[in-house]
UniProtKB/Swiss-Prot annotation:
Keyword Transport: yes
Pfam families: HlyD_D23
SS bonds (residue pairs): none
Designated gene of the protein: bepD
Upregulation: Repressed by BepR.
Function: Involved in resistance to several unrelated toxic compounds, such as dyes, detergents and antibiotics.
Subunit structure, as described in the record: Probably part of a tripartite efflux pump, which is composed of an outer membrane efflux protein, an inner membrane protein and a protein that expands the periplasmic space. Could form a tripartite pump with BepC and BepE.
Family: Belongs to the membrane fusion protein (MFP) (TC 8.A.1) family.
InterPro entries hit by this protein: CusB_D23, MFP_Efflux, RND_pump_MFP
An example Gene Ontology molecular-function term: transmembrane transporter activity
Coiled coil regions in record: 98-139
GO biological process: one example: response to antibiotic
Protein name per its UniProtKB record: Efflux pump periplasmic linker BepD
SUPFAM superfamilies hit by this protein: HlyD-like secretion proteins
Amino acid sequence: MTLNRTIRCFAAGAAFIVFAAQPALAQAPGGATPPPPQVFVVDIKPHDVPVTYEYAARINAYRNVQVRARVGGILLHRNFVEGTQVKAGEVLFEIDPAPYQAELEKAQAQVAQAEAQYQQSIRDAERAEQLVQQKVQSAAVRDSAFATRDLNKAAVAAAKAQLRTAELNLSYTKVTAPISGITSQEQVNEGSLIGTDASSSLLTSVTQLDPVYVNFSFTDTEAAEIAKLRAERGATGEDADRLKIKILFGDGKAYDHEGTIDFTSSSLDTETGTLGVRAVVENPNHRLIPGQFVRAEILDIQVKDAITVPKAALMQSAQGQFVYVVNKDNVVEVRPVTGARELKNDWLISQGLNSGDRVITEGVIKAVPGRPVQPVVQGVDDKAQAEAGKEQAADKK
């Protein structure tokens, strides 16, 4: 229990002690009845309340892509400075192209050879057809010529496919950046023999840092609350699907750019009982770094027609939370309530209070359930009301 809560509980207890002592205090010296004690109250008026949901969050890269060799050979050159920005398509590494250039030339020759054979088979098939028409040659010889022509046509297609493969392999000797981002350290030194298997093909990685992801988690209760508030927001025509977040650093300073929640998990984590959430935020100056811990605060969430009371008004007993309410006869009543959420200066009350109720905020120690008080509405010319209360008390004497 906090110090303020302890004080409020003590105040509540003291009020009951005063109540027990009322018969002894009923008559002041000289037989005059003392005036009811003066207390400050707030009039309960439902209003829209912004609610803050704040979570521990972690920064993750928007994309982190491994750069791997797609052909083997000797690594000739590294064309970038480690840890610097590169653009998508920029050549990062060069692998010895000589063997792949030779394979390309071989494939080109095979295409030419296949084309020549195909053209010859076309001519042979045409002559065979003419001889059959002249009844000089059998149909079987003609059919064989047609089959040879079709086989040579397929051979041309296969040779061209080999040529495309050779062209691709030669192009793969220039390893380019798949995305724009920051490079990591090289994994293989120049002059090394590299392969295409998982253990030897990794050359470096590129990390995209603008934008970045902010990952955090809701509890199941908070997820339900936010879903309800988003539904209410959507019912009023507001955009309920794009919740904004503010990012706070460890020193309490806010990041320059707001983020937008773009993903919410469809199921709870069975180990933590939380719902994974992800937001995306601009990071043009790379102020946010993958792995960095921050605080994420959800913005623009409001509870419609909410009831709040100052923190000083809410007290705790063994039976639960309660406040002191002044009824229409200016008599103090104990009102059990349910505090839904602690705000900056107030408590959001989910049950127990209604519009128009007057809740005691100051002078609780003087308030006794079942006894009258002089209520002064807090924040509405307190001094004038206090003077008016004194005059009313004087008139009763």
